[in-house]
Structure formats: C-alpha cells, structure tokens
Amino acid sequence: MLISLRNSLLVAALVCAGFVQAADLDKGKEINGTCAACHSDNGQGGKKGEYPRIAGQQIKYIETQLRNFRARTRVNIPMFPYTQERELSDEDIKDISAYLAGIKLDTKMPTYTGTEDALTRLLMAEKVMIIPRSEGDLANGEKIYQKQCAGCHGKTGKGKGMFPMLVGQYTNYLQRQVDLYLKGDRPHDEEGTVGVLNGLKAEDIKDVLAYLTSIQETEQ
C-alpha cells in the first residue's frame, strides 16, 4: 500500500515536472506522408473541400476524430483503411495530431526578398491558404456566430480544446458537415441532432459561413 502510494506520488511529480513523453513530430511527419495523398503535404486539404483542411486544427479535435474513425463511431469510408486496417496506435494518433496542429498556413501571399530560388518561392507559396469569400449577410452571420457558436469555437473561429477550428476551412466542407448534423448522420457533440444547428434557418447558416470567410485575415 505504501509502495503503491509512493509510486502514485512519483508519477504525479513527473507529470507536474513535464516529464510526460512529448509527441514525436518526426514520426508525425512520416505518418503525414500517407495523409498527404488526400490532404496535401501541408494539410490544406484538396478538391475544393472534398478533403478538409487539417493543418493548424485543434490537436484534441484531430485526436478525437482519428479515434472515432478507428472505432467507426464516425462513418467515413475513405478513412477506414488508414485508421482501422493500419491499426493506427494511440501513439501514432498523438504524433500525427501534434504535427498537423503545428502547421501554420498564411492567409496572405509571402513577401519575397529577391534572393530566393524558384523552389524556395514555390514552397513558400504552398503554405498559403485563402478561402474565397462566400455570399451572405455578414452582420447577421456575425451576430449568430458570436451568440451561438463562439462559446465553443472561439470568437475568431480558431476553435479550442476538442472544438474544431472553423475559420480557414473550406465553406462547402463546413456546409456538408452541417447537413450531416441536421440529418443525424454525424452527432454534434453531445447534442445529437437537437441543439444550436436545428434552431437555425438555412439562410442563417449561409450567413454564418459567409462571416467565417470574412474573418480569416485575422488568423495571423
């Protein structure tokens, strides 16, 4: 009993002192080689939102979704071979999530000094992601977002904790996820299909998505 207590105290001390094993970013980068086929090398996603942006996403959100794919509690057939059959370990999930969360995509084209070669310029430009503005009533979108969405997703849409970043994400991808929530094909947190989204009109959702495209420049 005394030994067990001492061991527990030792573990607690190590955790407090920061000795918990950190994510292996090199391993995460290696795993991303598989993800890049759909989501691109820098995690921008692709095919105009058929594959979502995952770069800069909240680490806890990425971890949770990968575990959901692996357990098949979130249905996404293209993801099954990479999570279930490959048997993505908890450690792998931790590593790839940390790697992706650390990728920063600018919302403005880089300023070149004139000393860069062509390859360097190309690599710099590839780390830029600008979501086209979508149409909608920005004032209404801001009002609804700040009142009903910001509490979880943050005032600037960057997300927090297990709640995902929305700003900088493809508009048609976000709309597709909203549709899945409303149909009950994807649970919205613990609400199921009952909650904020069900109380919004289609025009309100359009306005919120338009508002999100208008504030991406603040993501610096």
Feature locations, PLM:
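Bacterial N-terminal signal peptides that target proteins for export
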Residues: 1-9
